[in-house]
C-alpha cells in the first residue's frame, strides 16, 4: 500500500527506479492480482480476519485507486474506448513498451482479467459500466476465427507449432494488436513487428503466449453480469 503512487498505480517491481519496471503493469495480471488481494484483506476473508480495521481501510482505498487507474488507462482509438496495453507509462498513462518483444499495443490477454475484475464490482457506476461495455465490444470485434494451433516436429527435431485453417474451432485472440489498426502482431527479441507468427524465431514463438481463448470467459461472464445488473 505504501508503494502505491499518487496516480493510483502499481509498478511491476519495487524498488526498481528505472526502466520498464516503473510502468503501470497489467502484464501477467500483476495489478489485478494485487487488487484482488487488497479486496480479500478489506473484506476480511480467510486468512485475513485478523487484519485491523485501520489496515482494511487503507486496503479499500488502494483498491478504489486501482479501479480509478483502470478507467483512466483504457485505450481510446479513433474516439472509441477499447481495452488496455500490458503496461502503461506511469506519467502519461499511454501504452508503453516493456521487453523488446512487448511493444505498445492492445492486449488480448491481460485485458480479459481487467474486464472480469470490473464486472465483479458491486453497484457499478455508469463510468464502470461504459468501460466494460466498450471493452466487451472490442473482444467481440477482435476475435480471430478459422484458425488453430497445429504442433509438429521441425527439421531440427524441436517441437514447434503453426497456425492452420480450422472451420469449427472456437475463436482465439492475439496477445498483441496494433494501436494503429487493431491488427494482430508478433515480435522477436529484435522488437520488429511481424504479422505472421511463422516469421518470428522458434525460441520466442514457443517461449511466449501469443494466442489465447480467454476472451470466451469475458463474453460468458458479460452475459451473466448484464442479467445480474439488469443491463439491457
Q: Which ranges hold each PLM region?
A:
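Single conserved hydrophobic/aromatic residue that forms the stacking wall/gate
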Residues: 1-9
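Positively charged
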Residues: 69-86, 147-154
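Short sequence/structural elements of tandem HEAT/ARM alpha-solenoid repeats
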Residues: 3, 61, 83-87, 130-133
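Terminal, non-catalytic domain-edge segments
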Residues: 36, 40-65, 92-98, 102, ...
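Solenoidal tandem-repeat scaffolds enriched in leucines and small polar residues
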Residues: 3, 18-21, 25-37, 43-47
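Short capping loops/turns at secondary-structure boundaries
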Residues: 16, 20-31, 52, 56-59, ...
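A cross-kingdom feature marking solvent-exposed beta-strand/loop segments within repeated
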Residues: 10-26, 90-104
Amino acid at each position: 500500500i505504501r508503494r502505491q503512487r499518487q496516480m493510483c498505480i502499481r509498478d511491476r517491481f519495487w524498488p526498481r527506479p528505472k526502466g520498464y519496471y516503473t510502468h503501470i503493469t497489467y502484464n501477467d495480471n500483476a495489478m489485478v492480482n494485487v487488487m484482488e488481494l487488497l479486496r480479500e484483506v478489506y473484506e476480511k476473508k480467510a486468512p485475513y480476519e485478523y487484519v485491523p480495521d485501520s489496515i482494511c481501510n487503507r486496503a479499500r482505498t488502494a483498491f478504489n485507486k486501482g479501479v480509478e487507474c483502470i478507467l483512466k488507462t483504457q485505450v481510446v482509438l479513433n474516439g472509441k474506448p477499447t481495452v488496455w496495453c500490458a503496461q502503461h507509462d506511469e506519467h502519461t498513462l499511454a501504452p508503453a513498451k516493456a521487453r523488446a518483444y512487448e511493444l505498445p499495443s492492445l492486449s488480448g490477454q491481460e485485458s480479459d482479467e481487467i474486464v472480469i475484475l470490473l464486472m465483479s464490482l458491486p453497484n457499478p457506476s455508469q463510468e464502470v459500466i461504459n468501460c466494460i461495455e466498450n471493452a466487451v465490444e472490442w473482444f467481440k470485434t477482435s476475435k480471430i476465427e478459422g484458425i488453430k494451433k497445429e504442433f509438429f516436429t521441425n527439421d531440427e527435431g524441436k517441437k514447434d507449432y503453426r497456425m492452420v485453417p480450422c472451420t469449427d474451432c472456437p475463436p482465439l485472440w492475439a496477445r498483441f494488436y496494433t494501436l494503429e489498426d487493431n491488427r494482430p502482431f508478433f515480435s522477436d527479441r529484435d522488437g520488429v513487428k511481424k504479422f505472421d507468427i511463422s516469421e518470428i524465431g522458434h525460441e520466442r514463438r514457443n517461449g511466449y503466449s501469443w494466442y489465447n481463448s480467454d476472451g470466451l470467459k469475458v463474453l460468458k461472464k458479460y452475459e451473466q453480469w448484464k442479467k445480474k445488473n439488469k443491463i439491457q
